[in-house]
Amino acid sequence: IVGTGKSRHPQCVAISGEDGVGKSALLDKAKQMVRGYQMIPLYAACYREESEFFLRPWNDIFWEVEQCVENGLLERSITKEEQAQLDRFFKGSILGDEKPLGRLTYQLMEKAILDMFRKIAEKHKVVLFFDDIQWMDTMSFQLLNRILLTLGTERILLMCTYNQNNDVEVMESLEKLMKKDYLHVISLNPF
């Protein structure tokens, strides 16, 4: 995570490997280490069963942000009204309210989320942890790319795991980060 790319900026890390090789354990260890560096770790696991639900992993991320606010680690970076709006949005998409997201709805939500992370990043470094990112939905990948490409990797980083069998799909979803030299891939192999 603290390594730098050719452009001398911090790089995000994707950990690839087969099932049972230790990707999640390495991710957990990195999450513990991040806390020691006074960074804010935000974690979500992606599941095959939930891969069709729009923005499902982000619900966990926002829950963790709320926990950090309640525990005094973060100042409230969005208004209670914006939080209520995001809550309604996520509850609707998670409870299977299958109405397609309107373009305007998504843009408003994306803007609120970018503003939230921008405000958090003014005072804190944040690391987004996603386990089994191969199960992340397209819209979640879109939002992740947007956050990292808009705000850069100086204050917000990504660390994720994925099954090597899904390498092509994951790399296509993170292609923009690769092109900017924002992502370093580590392959774990069994002994």
Residue ranges and their predicted role:
Residues 1-191:
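Key residue(s) within conserved catalytic/signature motifs
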